[in-house]
Amino acid sequence: GGLGEAGVAALDEFVRAGGTLVALEEASRFAIEALGLPVRDMVAGLSAADFFIPGSILRLDVERESRLAAGMPERTIAWFGDGSTAFEPTGAGVRVAARYGTGNPLLSGWALGAERIAGAAALVEVEHGVGEVVLFGFRPQYRAQSMATFPLLFNAMRLPAPEGERAGR
């Protein structure tokens, strides 16, 4: 099953032609690898002895100038589960829309190695051709915890990137 090579090629073509792909958690890992995005998954390959957050609430600092932040406060919460991640931009064309809190981002639950993602990108917009890929490192639609992050997901789906950003490439 899965997309296969033809499906990945079609997805790549869709985004490069001006489409928007929104990927959550583990799907972000797929998008990074399949589309060759200039972003590194910061928790990939870490052992559970070094990093393990099985389902906790972390502080999220929102970059207010991001289009994804429309209607959002500067600080909110995010559900970080077993499939969640953090990102490190590795090239041009990556805009950080939200970061995990600095210091100790843990607000509720428990975490091993949370300092590894403190201050790291949690939500990024990545230019890809004339389109973009929006990568969520956390789950913005997890039960009632998501009331704080639904707007980020809705903004990713409904608000186009500013024309100047796409046209200026």
Task: Give the ranges of each region predicted by the language model.
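Short alpha-beta junction capping motif
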Residues: 1-30, 130, 156
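Aromatic- and carboxylate-enriched substrate-binding clefts and catalytic-loop regions
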Residues: 1-4, 29, 42-51, 56
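Active-site-proximal structural scaffolding
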Residues: 4-7, 14-15, 24, 51-53, ...
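Low-complexity, Gly/Pro
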Residues: 23, 32, 123, 157, ...
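Short His-Asn-centered micro-motif
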Residues: 23-26, 43, 64
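Short secondary-structure boundary/capping segments
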Residues: 36-41, 150-152
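Catalytic beta-strand/loop cores that center a nucleophilic Ser/Cys/Thr
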Residues: 39-41, 48-49, 56-146, 161-166
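Short amphipathic C-terminal alpha-helix that caps PH/PH-like domains
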Residues: 149-160
